[in-house]
From Swiss-Prot:
Residues annotated to bind Fe cation: 119, 123, 310
Family: Belongs to the KAE1 / TsaD family.
InterPro entries: ATPase_NBD, Gcp-like_dom, KAE1/TsaD, Peptidase_M22_CS, TsaD
Catalysed conversion reaction: L-threonylcarbamoyladenylate + adenosine(37) in tRNA = N(6)-L-threonylcarbamoyladenosine(37) in tRNA + AMP + H(+)
Class of the enzyme per the UniProt entry, highest EC level: transferase
Annotated source species: Listeria welshimeri serovar 6b (strain ATCC 35897 / DSM 20650 / CCUG 15529 / CIP 8149 / NCTC 11857 / SLCC 5334 / V8)
GO terms for cellular component: cytoplasm
The protein, known as: tRNA N6-adenosine threonylcarbamoyltransferase
The keyword Oxidoreductase appears for this protein: no
Amino acid sequence: MGGLMKKNTVILGIESSCDETAASVVKNGNEIISSVVASQIESHKRFGGVVPEIASRHHVEQITLVIEEALTQANVTMDDLDGIAVTEGPGLVGALLIGVNAAKTLAFMHNLPLIGVHHIAGHIYANRFETEFKFPLLSLVVSGGHTELVLMKADNDFEIIGETRDDAAGEAYDKVARTLGLAYPGGVQIDKLAKEGEDTFHFPRAMMDDGSFDFSFSGLKSSFINTLHNLRQRGEEPNPNDMAASFQASVVDVLVSKTIRAAKKYDVKQLLLAGGVAANQGLRKRLIQEMKLELPDIELIIPPLSLCGDNAAMIAAAGTVSFLQGKRSSYDMNANPGLLLEDI
């Protein structure tokens, strides 16, 4: 590659914020040359959630192998890269450190620019593999740790116009799944059951009509757990499909109604779905239906399932945007579990 004629920007992305160790080579911020993800789901399953200590240990074991595999699959060497992008935060500090230290070491050894990336910016930029962004745009970010409505008027310009005041939607999914005795990760299991059930329990829709774009899922979670507990105390075992469908209907109602209201208010050109819960079939289906009805002129962009969960291609995509804007991180960059999206 190299030389003055070089037109392509080739970035290595590294992601280790939670329980996936991932590396990816991306060209021009929108073409995946390779993407390798080592998942730890099996190791965390018996604990019903991610154990930070176990996650860190897995990252240490996997990080070098995953990076080497990504370079091999892409048929590139370190000399072909223009820079290295890595998730700087938010996430589990011990997990983040593994990726950050690997990226810093490689960047230093090969004299390459280092670009720290916000994990949620990555989820949003996963949509760049689908299409170019048209501003202003709105992203509904739904994951295990985040539920946010993010307005963008330009690349890397993030304004959070709504967020959860307590539990993230993905967190509520996992807790509700545990009370039903479902395996981790719970979101997928609830989604499957919900397809076969009906919304017979009519759980609360918190903050649905309060005028803000904020969310709250702790009341729904409590209502679900109490309903299940009361039924079991009476010797009844409720239909898990209906319980799941009722829970999911409540979450999806709130997410979709607030998103559509925000899209109307801010007169956006595109609506993006982002984050792990973007894989949820119930949410996807409902968003597509409601957008067709309410906002047929706004382009709805939903990432493929392979790019909803944590991956490094999205980090490379977001990193490419920062790289082309001239943003660089210094070699003393550290893992930042409390990194704010609006600060980047």
